[in-house]
Amino acid sequence: MKDKLTDALYGLGWSTVKKLPEPVAVRLGQRIADETWKRRGKGVLRLEANLARVVPDAPPSRLAELSRAGMRSYLRYWMESFRLPAWSPRRIQDGFDVKDLHYLVDGLAEGRGVVLALPHMGNYDLAGAWVTTHLGVPFTTVAERLKPESLYDRFVAYREGLGMEVLPHQGGSAFGTLARRLRSGGLVCLVADRDLSASGVEVSFFGERAKMPAGPAALALQTGAPLLPVTLWYDESPVMRGRVHPPVEVPADGNRAERIAVMAQETADAFAAGIAEHPEDWHMLQRLWLADLDGGPGASGKPGDSPDPGGPGNSGGPGDPGSPGSPGRPGMEKP
C-alpha cells in the first residue's frame, strides 16, 4: 500500500504541477517548503546539521535561515522537475546559464568522452535537459531499481523523455556500459557526493571524513576521458546557474586504488568549493559524514536518522559507478 501511495504521489506531481501557471507553481513550492521547514522534521534537522559543517561559524539563527532557504531551493527542484516534460526547447535553453562550458566542449571535441560528476545541488535534470537541447549531446546516467517497479519506470521514462540514456544500476555491468559509451566519445553524468557502500572512497570533506563513489574517477582512469566536476545553484531569477570546474588531474604515480583516491579527493574539493559558495542549494537531507554514521563526534543519534540503503549512491559492488540515487520518501530525497 505504501509503495502504491508513493507511486501515486509522484504520478500526481507530474500530471498536475506541469499544468499550473509558472508563478503559481513557484508560490506553491515555496509554501510547501516553508510549512515543511516549520515542522522541523528529520530531514530539516539533518539538513541543518549538515550545513553546520559547511558554515561552522554560523550561529543558530544563520543556520535556520540557511535551512529555510535550502528547503525552498529543494522544493524549487521538485516543482521544476514536475514541469520539465512540458517545457519547450527554448524554455530549457533559457533556464540554465553555465560558466566555463569550454571545459566540456573541449573535452567532447577530443573524442575521448567526458565524465561529469555532480553533487546534490540545484536541478541536475534541468542541466541534463539543457545539455541535450542546447549542445545536442545525449548522455548516459544510471538509476537504482525502485519499488514499486512502476515508480522506477516513471523515473526512467521521465529522464529518457529529457534525452538521457538511463541504465539500471547493477554494479559492474553498468560500469562496463558506461566505459563503452565513453570510449565511443559519449558523455556520462553521475551524481557523486555520497556513497555509504563498501566500495565508497574515503575523502576529507569540509574537514571531516566522508565517503564518495569511486566510479567517476575509475571511469576516467580506465578510459582516458576527462573528469569534470559540476556545481549548480539558484539565484532570485528563474534561471539556474552552474559552473564546470577544471578537469581533475590524473596522478602519474600510485596503483589504481591510490590514483582513484586522489581523484576522488580532488572531486570532493571541487564540490566543497561550490557548496561553500551556495550552501542553501546543496540538498543533502541525509547523513553523510562518517562521524554521524558510526557514533563519533557530531553524531546526532536521532531515531530514524539512519542511513537509507536505497538513497543516493549507496549501492556497492566492484567498480561501482555511482548513482543518481533513488527518490526515497516523497519530500525527503532527490531522485
Residue ranges and their predicted role:
Residues 45, 102, 125-126, 152-153, ...:
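Residue-level marker for well-ordered alpha-helical positions
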